[in-house]
A protein has these predicted regions:
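Short, ligand-facing micro-motifs at secondary-structure edges
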Residues: 64-75, 92-118, 133-137, 146-150, ...
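Short, recurring structural edge motifs at helix starts
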Residues: 17-23, 44-45, 79, 155-157, ...
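Short amphipathic coiled-coil heptad-repeat segments
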Residues: 1-27, 197-234, 415-433
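Extracellular/lumenal glycan-associated surfaces
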Residues: 179-191, 195-198, 234-236, 240, ...
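A short glycine-rich beta-alpha junction/loop motif
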Residues: 115-121, 152-179, 252, 259, ...
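Sequence-specific dsDNA recognition surfaces
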Residues: 34-46, 61-91, 239-255, 271-306
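Non-catalytic DNA-recognition/assembly elements of restriction-modification systems
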Residues: 21-42, 167, 225-249
């Protein structure tokens, strides 16, 4: 009797990626890892042995902090001791210790020979019929990963032994197909690395520009300026430049929703993590207040140019701000753990959002933060800080526009990076069931 398709074991094929599916597509063979590889262990060395230069080494912690499917080179070194284990090239390494069972079942290939393999590393050397990178992907993904995670033992520290890895069964296509899969993920990883570097470069450029485009402590002009602007900048106490009478609310996350409502709420957690220096009300996502209308918030509705300060955080990001722009017909209020600063005089859109997130301003807040586990700022203390700004609104606008363009590029590369990571995740889920 023929089984119903829904009850048949899924065939491990990659037709959708490499070739049209057909009856002749070879199925994948199931093998115990103990039958296809030689197992050994790394020897000695810990992070206390690391030094600036010496013999290159891989410690098990690298697989958690700097994971790569294929390790071509390393930037950690030790002074060589007798009895060390060196890579020959092609070894698959799996950490023998970790903090969680989920994290411990990961594997990398050591491509380069001559690298010391430290203690707490399981070393798996597959026979010639099996591709090392494919084996690493198999251990790190799908059913094999889940099964190995279930074998990890321990509480505060979990352990995975070579015997555990040897006992696992996994499915393998032909060597040629293994290599194709390995090459596919290599290309995806290369693209991810490329966009990660571009993203990090732009983040560093922005950080540098924030430092150089605003006057440092004690200076009246910034390090770099746009051509044609030479006048000293204005300096004012914050409560001279801004009005602090716009109230916030104390609504919790439980009183907000993402679906519907008539009034939107700026939550301090979103200021700290989600929003940039400029909050575009028409284009950024703001939660709605459940079951309330604007009549409930008379005198509290925000305007373009309002600065929202997050007055509480777990670290020195306390005091991060966002400037409200493009509000149009939306009704928005400031939420829990925020302060509203409304400029007394019109300024260029975005200027104060960027300025008050720069070290030029934020350094004033650091000695004012109070608390141990949670840091907070009082309105009284914040009002005593000073702000600096060019008299000419054209210069203000050029500064804001420059930084917004950098932010746009950062967002673009971040989205590309996320898209590639999602593509990789999808491929792993489809290839390693």
């Amino acid at each position: 009797m023929q089984n119903h398709p829904a009850h048949q074991e899924p065939r491990r094929v990659l037709g959708s990626f490499f070739a049209p599916k057909s009856q002749n597509t070879p199925t994948w063979e199931q093998r115990k890892l103990g039958e296809i590889a030689v197992f050994s262990k790394g020897v000695g060395y810990s992070k206390n042995d690391l030094c600036e230069e010496g013999t290159p080494i891989i410690l098990y912690g690298r697989l958690y902090t700097k994971y790569e499917t294929c390790i071509f080179d390393v930037d950690t070194f030790v002074k060589e001791k007798a009895g060390g284990v060196y890579s020959k090239g092609g070894e698959v390494i799996v950490p023998a210790s970790g903090e969680t069972a989920e994290d411990i079942s990961i594997a990398s290939v050591v491509v380069k020979p001559g690298i010391l393999l430290g203690g707490d590393l399981n070393i798996v050397s597959p026979t010639a019929e099996y591709d090392s990178a494919f084996l690493a992907l198999t251990i790190s993904s799908g059913a094999t990963h889940k099964y190995l995670s279930s074998l990890a033992q321990g509480k505060s520290v979990v352990h995975l032994h070579n015997a555990d890895i040897q006992s696992v069964s996994a499915k393998f296509p032909t060597k040629r197909e293994q290599e194709k899969i390995h090459l596919l993920f290599g290309k995806i990883d290369t693209l991810i690395t490329l966009h990660q570097r571009k993203y990090e470069k732009l983040v560093n450029i922005k950080k540098s520009m924030l430092n150089k485009m605003f006057p440092p402590n004690g200076a009246s002009v910034p390090e770099i300026r746009f051509k044609g602007f030479t006048d000293p900048w204005e300096q004012r106490k914050l409560d001279e430049a801004f009005d602090f009478t716009v109230p916030n609310n104390t609504l919790s996350r439980a009183e907000l929703n993402q679906e519907s409502g008539s009034v939107r709420n700026v939550h301090y957690g979103d200021v700290l993590i989600k929003y940039g220096s400029v909050l575009d009300v028409q284009n950024d996502e703001l939660p709605f207040i459940t079951g309330r209308s604007k009549d409930d918030f008379k005198g509290a509705l925000l305007q373009n140019g309002d600065i929202i300060i997050a007055d509480t955080a777990e670290d020195e990001t306390t005091g991060k701000v966002c400037e409200i722009v493009n509000i149009q017909d939306k009704d928005v209020v400031a939420g829990l753990h925020t302060m509203v600063c409304r400029p007394k005089n019109k300024t260029a859109e975005g200027y104060f959002g960027y300025y008050m997130n720069s070290s030029s301003y934020h350094h004033q807040l650091l000695p004012l933060m109070q608390g141990i586990k949670v840091l907070s700022l009082s309105k009284t203390n914040v009002q005593k800080t000073t702000v600096k700004y060019p008299k000419d609104k054209a210069e203000q606008q050029k500064i804001a526009d420059c930084l917004r363009r950098i932010d746009t590029l950062i967002t673009l590369h971040q989205r590309k990076l996320e898209k590639l990571q999602n593509i990789k995740k999808s491929c792993l889920e489809k290839m390693f069931v």
